Amino acid sequence: MRIRFFLAILALCGSVTAINAQASLKLPETVKVSPAALNAEPICDPKISASWRKAQEIEGVKIRESNLCSPDNPYLIAAAVKGTNNISMATLMETNLSPDAIIKTDDIDGDGDPDRITIKLEVVELNGKTPDFEGVLPTFDIAPGVQPGAWVFAPKTSGMSTENFESIKANSLLRLPSPVIRVEVGDIVQIVLENTHYLPHTIHLHGVDHPFTHSDGHVAGGDGVPQTNEMFLMPGESRVYEFQPRQSGTMLYHCHVQTHTHLAMGLVGMIIVEENRPNNWLQTLNVGGGHVRYPSVAIQEDFDEEFDLHYHAMDKELHEIIQKYNDPRLIARDMNRLYDITDAKEDYFTLNGLSFPYTLRESLVIAEPDQKIKLRVANTASEMVALHTHGHKATITHYDGIEHNPIAQITRDVYALAAAQRLDLTLNTTNDGLHSYGEGIWLFHDHREKGITTNGMNPGGNVSAIVYKKYLNEIGLPMGLGVDISKYFTHEFHARKLPIWQDLDEAGSLGAPGVRTGFDPEIQNTLFNLFGGFIVGILIYLIIAKRQTALATITGVTSKLRSSKGDKANG
């Protein structure tokens, strides 16, 4: 009876094992995500007029051609060059700028350009929580569907913060990064910060020649540091930061209140001091950075083109704080006391405020053979950037605005930028096997591999490209010879819902696996555990229930063994 019982148990276990093995051999079918089910965006923003790409003259400002998919607004460029006080109302109305956003007056040195420059900046929140509905307002995507909360310095604007009454998207002036500011050596510059935010802020002119105090001796509006130089600029207040730079170079400006969070949130931008030249009307603001379509006289003397490249990175945990609360006290508590930057992990990596594929829209370096191109590069992330250029080796000419000894200047293809560091690079497109390998679509990106991801998804991050004009299509996008890039312009890709290799072959061999036809792996494990426990339980039961019989049997066997040994000894 007992033998038959144990045989039945063994047969049952064998059957379960066989069923389980058979189920595990049945691979699920590949399931493809249909293109019709994707939330896809146009590769180029349809709201941007194709006419903006053309070389044109507005208000006497000769604006260069831009072959980018999303070129800068030429009316904004004209306003930045002439000043909002020196243009027509028709031009001003095309910009969203306030009439007093950029004031240019007084040719003090008589060389044909204004020398007294006033720039008004506001503090703006992007992708913050709104009490009006579930969601964030105004929205600014760094990639399709990716909306980290942010704060930026922005030019003083007129009208709505959104594109229009029906939209929740931020108007074109309200974006990452904070705008690039350009002034000339010797200019008397006033940056007026109007704190339109709900927390205190200041401006620190990082690397820019500026006084510790104003001429009247009052310690206010100098270095921007509340602990040593000035009081917090509270909500609703304004402050003037005045300086007259004596040295040219690529510098920074940023908030110096709770710098560990405010700078990371986006309150940092590039400020460039240009060399003094006659008739040197500058593009005072380069909103969004990238191609400089009205370069300075000094740049035109030595270079064919100029590009501003601002690298930044963001910790998702920090940037979600303003998406949880509307109460400034709770935001201040979480940022100042609960958030621990020593545990921070950067998740978003941007170039000029955007991540791939949006970098293809407006942060390409467009080149032609045999050119010299000026690249001004800044890193405002908390970690190093290892910028690598494919197909080219550029020369580092300046560190933090200071020219490196020309004899010792380094030509290489990886350029290391520490936090807050700036480099000036000369990109030579002469096809000599050293400076350039020839025409093509050549990536440039951070070679710390997490820098080319967006919240861990690749490709993403700060990837962009040096693209020769012959490789651009009619709308300003690279004519690549590889995969179709349209899938990267879908929300599903960045939400990890789109298998990136599903279309590599007709069979979809690397697509998403569907539902298994056999047992689910978790069910298999559960069954194994149940039957294993059942068998162990039966064995324990038999040992306990039959312990008397077992002991008698063991005793009998032991007695027989002893008896047998005794007989042998007597024999």
Positions of predicted regions on the chain:
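Bacterial N-terminal signal peptides
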Residues: 7-15
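Sec/Tat signal peptide C-region and signal peptidase I cleavage site
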Residues: 17-21
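N-terminal, post-signal-peptide metal-ligating segments of extracellular/periplasmic oxidoreductases
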Residues: 22-201, 205, 209-211, 218-221, ...
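Asparagine-centered strand-capping/turn motif at beta-strand->loop junctions
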Residues: 193-197, 377-381, 431-432
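Extracellular/periplasmic metallocenter environments
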Residues: 198-201, 208-212, 221-288, 412-506
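Short aromatic-acidic-glycine turn motif
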Residues: 210-219, 279-281, 394-406
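Surface-exposed interaction/gating patches
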Residues: 297-395, 406, 417, 423-427
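Active/binding-pocket-proximal capping segment
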Residues: 380-383, 388-410, 443-450, 461-468
